């Protein structure tokens, strides 16, 4: 029952932050917002991987990580119409699909790692590493994205 309450707290926090993350992205920019959110989430999730002595400390860090990821979700949806003007529908569908698959793979992966190693440490660090990888990926393409946004050659759908 306690694990269910903790899960609900994380899901609620992430969901609540989506519109606020979109508003923040409108104010400071979607890319900048996402870079901050990836940093915060990665640090919090990596910290939980150090086997904290208190379940409440772990919960607090997970909630902050989920707040960050929820805000990042809002930032992603702020970026979609800027980057993919003619494919907004398909892109939002793909983003939603990726989120659903990612949520499934995360829980399945963490469970498999726990079963094979006896704890979640490696899985949490791998998950934090994905945030770092996303940060570097976004940082690496941001200049190219900014110079090609709105270009019909880049954003037009092709079959």
Annotate the PLM regions.
Residues 1-12, 90, 122-125:
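Loop-to-transmembrane helix entry
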Residues 11-19, 100-104:
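Residue-level signature of mid-helix packing/kink "hotspots" within the transmembrane helices
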Residues 17-29:
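Helix-to-loop junctions at the C-terminal end of transmembrane segments
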Residues 24-25, 109-118:
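Interfacial helix-cap and linker-helix signal at transmembrane-aqueous boundaries
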Residues 26-38:
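Cytoplasmic membrane-interface "Motif A"-like loop-to-helix N-cap segments
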Residues 39-53:
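C-terminal ends and interior cores of transmembrane alpha-helices
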Residues 71-84:
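Intracellular juxtamembrane helix-capping segments at the cytosolic ends
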Residues 122-140:
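Symmetry-related core transmembrane helices of the 12-TM Major Facilitator Superfamily/SLC fold
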């Amino acid at each position: 029952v306690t694990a269910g309450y903790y899960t609900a707290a994380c899901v609620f926090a992430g969901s609540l932050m989506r519109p606020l993350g979109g508003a923040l992205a409108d104010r400071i920019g979607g890319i900048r917002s996402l870079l901050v959110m990836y940093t915060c989430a990665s640090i919090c999730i990596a910290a939980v991987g150090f086997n904290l002595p208190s379940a409440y400390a772990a919960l607090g860090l997970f909630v902050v990580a989920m707040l960050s990821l929820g805000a990042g979700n809002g930032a992603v949806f702020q970026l979609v119409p800027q980057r993919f003007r003619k494919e907004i529908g398909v892109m939002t569908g793909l983003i939603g699909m990726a989120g659903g698959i990612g949520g499934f793979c995360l829980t399945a992966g963490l469970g498999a790692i726990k079963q094979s190693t006896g704890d979640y440490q490696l899985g949490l660090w791998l998950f934090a590493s994905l945030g770092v990888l996303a940060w570097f990926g976004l940082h690496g393409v941001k200049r190219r994205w900014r110079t090609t946004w709105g270009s019909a050659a880049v954003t037009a759908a092709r079959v």
